[in-house]
């Protein structure tokens, strides 16, 4: 009588390794998509938080505050009246860079704020432009003129 030893054969181990490799490869591409989506949501939340803060600060300081979006550098620059707002919270000398934060890989695809790339709050907190800021071609921040209320939509 032939007895078998307990354990796994080399073929069984190779098959298990191949199956694990396929599962890991499939999940890593999905994980990358999830990571990009989290970064885009984080960037949208950062921008909308700054919009809310700028509206409040314009009323509190009784000064005009504006954002100038730069699609090429993935940044927005914040001005108080016509001067760079160098001590704006969360900025580096008035500039907020999406590529230098945890939001790297986020692209400001387009900005259309009444035909410009500038979002302005007057000293009463009134938003002088309305329009859209689009991130990575599928996340839109819609800002309403006058109220400055915003809405984040998937495209």
Question: What kind of feature is each model-predicted range?
Answer:
Residues 1-31, 50:
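N-terminal single-pass transmembrane signal-anchor helix
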Residues 2, 22, 26-38, 42, ...:
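N-terminal helix-rich module
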Residues 41-50:
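Transition segment at domain starts
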């Amino acid at each position: 009588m032939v007895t078998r030893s307990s354990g796994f054969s080399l073929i069984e181990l190779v098959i298990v390794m191949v199956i694990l490799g396929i599962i890991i490869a499939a999940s890593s591409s999905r994980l990358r998509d999830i990571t990009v989506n989290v970064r885009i949501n984080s960037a949208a939340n950062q921008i909308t938080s700054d919009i809310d803060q700028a509206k409040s600060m314009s009323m509190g300081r009784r000064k005009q505050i504006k954002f100038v979006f730069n699609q090429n550098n993935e940044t927005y620059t914040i001005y108080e009246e016509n001067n760079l707002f160098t001590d704006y919270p969360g900025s580096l000398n008035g500039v907020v860079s999406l590529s230098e934060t945890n939001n790297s890989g986020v692209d400001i695809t387009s900005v259309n704020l009444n035909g410009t790339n500038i979002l302005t709050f007057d000293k009463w907190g009134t938003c002088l432009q309305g329009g859209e800021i689009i991130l990575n071609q599928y996340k839109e921040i819609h800002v309403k003129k006058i109220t400055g209320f915003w809405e984040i939509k998937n495209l």
